[in-house]
Curated annotation (Swiss-Prot):
Keywords: ANK repeat, Cell projection, Coiled coil, Cytoplasm, Hydroxylation, Phosphoprotein, Repeat, Ubl conjugation. This is Ankyrin repeat and SAM domain-containing protein 3. PROSITE patterns: ANK_REP_REGION, ANK_REPEAT, SAM_DOMAIN. Residues 501-526 form a coiled coil. The modification Phosphoserine is found at residues 2, 5, 201, 225, 243-245, 320, 368, 371, 375, 541. Residues 425-488 form the SAM domain. It is found in: Cell projection, Cilium; Cytoplasm.
Amino acid sequence: MSELSDEASEPELLNRSLSMWHGLGTQVSGEELDVPLDLHTAASIGQYEVVKECVQRRELDLNKKNGGGWTPLMYASYIGHDTIVHLLLEAGVSVNVPTPEGQTPLMLASSCGNESIAYFLLQQGAELEMKDIQGWTALFHCTSAGHQHMVRFLLDSGANANVREPICGFTPLMEAAAAGHEIIVQYFLNHGVKVDARDHSGATARMLAKQYGHMKIVALMDTYSPSLPKSLYRSPEKYEDLSSSDESCPAPQRQRPCRKKGVSIHEGPRALARITGIGLGGRAPRPRYEQAPPRGYVTFNSSGENPLEEEGLCCRDVTSPINERDVESSSSSSSREEHAFCANLGPVQSSSSSEGLARAQGLSSEASVESNEDSDHACKSSARKQAKSYMKTKNPDSQWPPRAATDREGFLAESSPQTQRAPYSGPQDLAALLEQIGCLKYLQVFEEQDVDLRIFLTLTESDLKEIGITLFGPKRKMTSAIARWHSSARPPGDALELAYADRLEAEMQELAIQLHKRCEEVEATRGQVCQEQELRAVVESCLLEQDRAREDLQARLRETWALARDAALVLDQLRACQAELSSRVRQDQPPGAATLGLAVPPADSKGWQASLQAMSLPELSGALEDRVREMGQALCLVTQSLEKLQVLNGKKWRET
């Protein structure tokens, strides 16, 4: 195969056969370089034409398992090649053949969220309630991986939502609650699952959610089951009754060693790491020979031979990195010898099936595979396209995905002390900085705004946009340069780790801006809380003063009531004197002399009237004057008491 160019697209790469590097100057014919794809590899990397050719020849057993115990349908179902799955199903392959772990193609598709493939498999008679060696059904696998749409699809297809796995006694609802999948828990509750079911330790789904700090799920389950007894909310001796404030506390780590999760997309890179001898740290051994293979070639050698001996190279079956049991296989039914990948892999132009070969550059194998277990299969292709388009703009000489540089420590550790750069001091003016990042043409824009280097280093992305830097590329370069200046990092370059560091620095700067805003919001909230506390203290003091004023008012009212009662008694006496005086005037007869010199009668009304009849007219007149004087004094006291009540009540008494 001719050397691949940087402009080669992914379909062009997939349509070419695999090739090997036989050393510099070695003359090898094109026929010897061609390595045909077997059916399992073609199904795993999405080679529809190769699979179609194998199906049409009718010479191969489509249900045959490879050394790892996987069929072509399993690979296509796991990766998500729906066209190949449809082709194999039309050819009549078996849909319920399990792997050595007991996982059917439906379980593999469910673990990766491939909803369309699960639909095809169910249409062809796939058993929905079939269990693997752990006792997990397809519903368990998609629930554990967090694929919401797949869970809803299986529930609508009639999956048993109350099934239990035998190890811990978990139901799918318990698995979702313990893992924190809130939307999946919502689906199960809407489906009507048993929320009061307990596992082998006596814990319910609500207890598991509370134990691992998923308080939103706890509140969600409380809204769906408000009448549950409190005995279900607390397990004796094992689970404490946590308050709602526990959500702010760090949740315990979920460690479940007794239970194994379903198939993960990360198993592919791990398997490839064991094949190639490269650890998950992303560091490959350094080459011990001077000859380096050209771009686009992969070296092969026998595991027991010296890497320098190129005569031992031969073809082999391509081992898929997805099924880790492929590594354990020591023999194959084919006549070709079994060889392992050389530990010193050269640069490889990889497709979706060989992205794990990025470990040859010292990069992380897990990061080289575009995986998102918490999202559905529809999001994978768009994320992969965005990653590739981003790398074309950041580093046109490299075709590795941007996520392949997540293991920065392993990559940077490979640089020798002689190649490390000197400490970066930074440019002295704005023109030098802009020239360094390739944005010198924008110097005039900053000069018009009177922006020097000191002001430039304080600008944010929104400030640059306001000044007039509207293009995304220059704006990102400037924000990365500002972030690098503040972090005293090295200047930007063309290396892959520097491109990744630029993106991280920009994200860190944006996070710092958001943190500053949040701190300001927290300070404003604290000020509001202080104001509310002061207002509360003022209101409490006002209430205390009102209570004291009310008590004084009640005391004054009691005194006024007593004075009014005395005034009423004097008024009755005055009326009696007036009545007697009126009767005497009408009779026009002088009273007897025996009544002269009588003392003031008692205050009793009956005795008062009897004594008035015995008084003379002058005495009666004097008694009337005395009663009028007492009446005036009583009214004066009542008026004074009412005036005191006016002050306490806050308004004039006579105004009412």
